[in-house]
Amino acid sequence: LGPMFVDLIAQRQELAAWVGYDDCEEFLWDWSYNREYFPEDLDGYLQEIQQELVPLFEAVQESGLYDQVYRRRYGEQQCLAYLSSGANAMGGGIQEAYEEMTGRALYDIAPSAQKYEGSFEIYLTSYDAPFVFLNPYEDISDFLSFAHEFGHFTNDYLTGGSYVTTDVAELMSQGMEYMSLCYATEPSAQVLDTARQLKMADSLGVYVGQAAYYSFERQAYQLTGDDLTVENLNAIYSQVAQDFGFDSVGWDEAGWTEITHFFTNPFYVISYVVSNDGAMQLYQMEQDEAGAGLELFLELLETEEDIPLLTLLESKELESPFERVSQVAETFREEFDLVTDGAGR
């Protein structure tokens, strides 16, 4: 896969030059995404994530939380029970979408060794309906993965096939993860508390991990000519692993080859970071006032136009992700009862 990615970068650089771009990242950004922020706007954001969130990420990795979370196995029926209880409690368009999905069997979450390794939601025009595909790990993470794809499903169902931007689409999916945790009642209170801990740890991991992937990606596309080699890509990833705390949990210098988006959707991964922040704001609203986050989320799920995320957040009186890193860090400190010094460590 390494040589394949080298070829892809070279071909994309050639295409960028052919249409008049000096910078391949700028070309891919302009042609693929409707964003109101640009690569140069993210320099300070990445630095803040490194300073404020990486130390917390390292502390959580060392806490043993994941060993506890993944110890127990869960099956398809428990996964359905989780989302069903949450959707019914949330009501409105969410409940309607869930009934459509299950009533017409517009999902596949059964385990199989022959299934594609991954999860996704897609709108099937021949069925005039969305469809959810999940290759489960048969652990508690499946609850959140199913909710994630169901967020996309609900947005597509309510709009008849949404045309929202990448960032906004991920707000729908990650928002559903958070809201499902607030309203699900199955399988049990203990399991739901474990799922909430996992989601918060996963959210911290999204900030740090996806920011790290973006940092790697933008450096990779700066390599040209004889410098564009697998060895140099491995070296960049090794440095990124140190910068973002991956070396605290073990890593492989060629681990970047496992990130599908690098091959299929260049510069997509930063969308996970900024949309996760918007989704977390919904969760915080819900925690502060029961029903407030859900009410706004139900409105957002009916978004269908190609509107940039920052404009959408502002229109709903939510904050810009780029102004919240310190606040987010404090939320995680409280969640995981972490004590750090003034530098975030």
Regions found by a protein language model. Give the residues of each.
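Contiguous, non-catalytic segments that form substrate-binding/exosite surfaces or channel walls
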Residues: 1-131, 315, 319
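N-terminal maturation segment of proteins
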Residues: 17, 213-221, 268
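Short pre-active-site segment immediately N-terminal to the catalytic Zn-binding motif
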Residues: 125-146, 158-162
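Short, glycine/acidic-rich hinge or "gate" loops at secondary-structure transitions
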Residues: 18-27, 61-68, 97-102, 162-168, ...
